Amino acid sequence: MTSKLDQLREITTVVADTGDIEAVARLKPVDCTTNPSIVLKALGTPMFADAIKEAVAWGKTQGGNPEAVSSAVADRLAISVGAALVKLVPGRVSTEVDADLSFDTEASLAKARSIIAAYKDRGIERDRILIKLASTWEGIRAAEVLQKEGIDCNLTLLFSKAQAIACADAKVFLISPFVGRILDWYKKSTGKDYTAEEDPGVISVRDIYNYYKANDIKTIVMGASFRNAGEIEALAGCDRLTISPALLDELAKDEGKLERKLSPESRKPDAKVSVDEKTFRWMMNEDAMATEKLAEGIRAFAKDLTTLRTMVQKELQLAAA
């Protein structure tokens, strides 16, 4: 009998949400996604000890204030993790723009371009990379510009249809609507448990997927942030799903039948709309869950980025002693 993971691969592009080199080599996903939390975890493994030494040695040769140097070294380390993953997957690796730039379009553009240039310096072309940006109004505007420059983007921390519509308007390459974090919010808010079919995160991604397919929107829908295998199974057939190694392993061990839940052919009419800035901000204001989870996600990624920069500062100080 074929595993559910293999059945899923027949209808959905499977992406690994990890920086764990061994897991990626074993599970053989098409793409990989990273974020500051994943980069920080990867750098804590022996596999990246040499990369840390190299980045710190490079940092010692850089001028400028200590904060700028530590930020540049942190960027270099994130690229090191991404470059290692690129060697293991046939597709793309997502690298995230600093979370503390989520409300600054111009700074996000500068950072994204520098990430692409850093990969280029390592012989990795832009067609192997996705630039991850938070789905704020400013992040979406940055993505719109980058897409016109031939830099494909992955819009993350997406919790609402308003964000998905704005991303479609901007013609971004890919969106990552979250599932598990939406479920977390509703469970905390209502005190209820939800089956996979009732799961508000699953329902949200299905609605976005249907809207895109109903209107022939080319942006790829990649479900993200899963709490259990049931959520993944409930979105079988989605364009892509980015999944943690633990849940990939669980699906690989399950030889039950996987039913396709999503397909372009099953789309239902859903009139196409566009959103300007004031409409976007109002729709987000009216969606307490999306507003809270977006802000929470940005804070969490910014915290991990600060932790990484602090680690780098300590390494630089030790190297200078």
Curated annotation (Swiss-Prot):
Catalytic activity entry: D-sedoheptulose 7-phosphate + D-glyceraldehyde 3-phosphate = D-erythrose 4-phosphate + beta-D-fructose 6-phosphate
EC number: 2.2.1.2
InterPro entries for this protein: Aldolase_TIM, TAL/FSA, Transaldolase_1, Transaldolase_AS
Compartments where found: Cytoplasm
Domain of life: Bacteria
One of the Pfam families matching this protein, by short name: TAL_FSA
One MF term in the entry's GO annotations: transaldolase activity
Keywords: Cytoplasm, Pentose shunt, Schiff base, Transferase
Gene Ontology biological-process entries: carbohydrate metabolic process; pentose-phosphate shunt
Keyword Transmembrane helix listed: no
Residue ranges crossing the lipid bilayer per the database entry: none
Cellular component GO terms held in the UniProt record: cytosol
Active site feature: 132 (schiff-base intermediate with substrate)
Associated pathway: Carbohydrate degradation; pentose phosphate pathway; D-glyceraldehyde 3-phosphate and beta-D-fructose 6-phosphate from D-ribose 5-phosphate and D-xylulose 5-phosphate (non-oxidative stage): step 2/3
Assembly and interaction partners: Homodimer.
Similarity field: Belongs to the transaldolase family. Type 1 subfamily.
Function: Transaldolase is important for the balance of metabolites in the pentose-phosphate pathway.
Protein name listed in UniProt: Transaldolase
Originating species: Rhizobium etli (strain CIAT 652)
